[in-house]
Curated annotation (Swiss-Prot):
Pfam families: AIRS (PF00586), AIRS_C (PF02769). Keywords: ATP-binding, Cytoplasm, Ligase, Nucleotide-binding, Purine biosynthesis. The lineage of its organism: Bacteria, Bacillati, Actinomycetota, Actinomycetes, Bifidobacteriales. It comes from the Bacteria. Its EC number is 6.3.3.1. NCBIfam families: purM (TIGR00878). One of its GO terms (cellular component) is cytosol. Signal peptide: none annotated. Pathway: Purine metabolism; IMP biosynthesis via de novo pathway; 5-amino-1-(5-phospho-D-ribosyl)imidazole from N(2)-formyl-N(1)-(5-phospho-D-ribosyl)glycinamide: step 2/2. One of its GO terms (molecular function) is phosphoribosylamine-glycine ligase activity. It is found in: Cytoplasm. It catalyses: 2-formamido-N(1)-(5-O-phospho-beta-D-ribosyl)acetamidine + ATP = 5-amino-1-(5-phospho-beta-D-ribosyl)imidazole + ADP + phosphate + H(+). The gene is purM. PANTHER family: TRIFUNCTIONAL PURINE BIOSYNTHETIC PROTEIN ADENOSINE-3, TRIFUNCTIONAL PURINE BIOSYNTHETIC PROTEIN ADENOSINE-3-RELATED. This is Phosphoribosylformylglycinamidine cyclo-ligase.
Amino acid sequence: MPKAYENAGVSVEAGYEVVKRIKSHVARTNRPGVVGGIGGFGGLFDLASLGYKEPVLISGTDGVGTKLMVAKLANKHDTIGIDCVAMCVNDIAAQGAEPLFFLDYIACGKNDPALLEQVVAGVADGCVQAGSALVGGETAEMPGMYDEDEYDLAGFSVGVAEKSAIVDGSTIAEGDVLIGLPSTGVHSNGFSLVRKALFEQAGYTVDTELDELGGEKLGDVLLTPTKIYVKALSPLFKAGVVKGVAHITGGGFIENIPRMIPDGLAAEIELGTWPVLPIFDVLEKAGNIDHKEMYNIFNMGIGMVLAIDPARKDEALKLLADNNEPAYVLGSITADTTGTQIVLK
């Protein structure tokens, strides 16, 4: 054992133990195209084996922000990895991508093999849900940079789409229908405000049980994993019914829906056309947040918004229903008369 490194606060043996523990989790993410296993200097993937004619690679990277601090407070680390995968694969799925492979990066103050196994197990769970292989990663023990009980998590996703099937919103037109896919909760954005409103202002803890939340512990509600939409979207992409997709993350409806809409057009959203999850009512009251501002911060119960030609609305809704995916008609595309590209009615 390298004593000098150990004396500096880095445990090489603990690093070996983490690799040993996570191998079985990585193995269950294997998918066609993967070449070899973990342990090399890079992850290998054979794109040609998938049979794409004009493949375009689509990549994304993200983390889970201060949701990690809620995981720490609740001492629950087995789902935060799902969030990390979801944030990345949902972004690339919004462009029509089939996720291929994923890499993670974990930085920590002290290498705790049992805890890090929980984190990576969650990453593997997310990869399985997304049909993405976990082909590599990095665990960096950084004493002095982080406290011993702190860690950070980031992910990197690469997917592929046929060049002709990339979803970029360019064909969105006035009259198109907006369909929303429900979220599972707060997902992984806005947690600095979540913590301030619930823990500082309202005085709640992760163990607080609220009637508004069905008596469930607040920490469990907040740590509900971000929904992965890959399997919900795949049949729609194959049918060619989707013109644009907005992943509702940081910035909520107000900032994310306009990202898919061409200049001169706007999304007109009819409030009340979908059920807003109770956690958002709790947040609004606890933080004394203006109701309209909530839509500029949180997903408000909708994690993905799809733009669909009205002639294919029923087809899209049937494809979702056949896949047991709930969906709501939220509104439509209109001319932009406000310069904001979005109107909440």
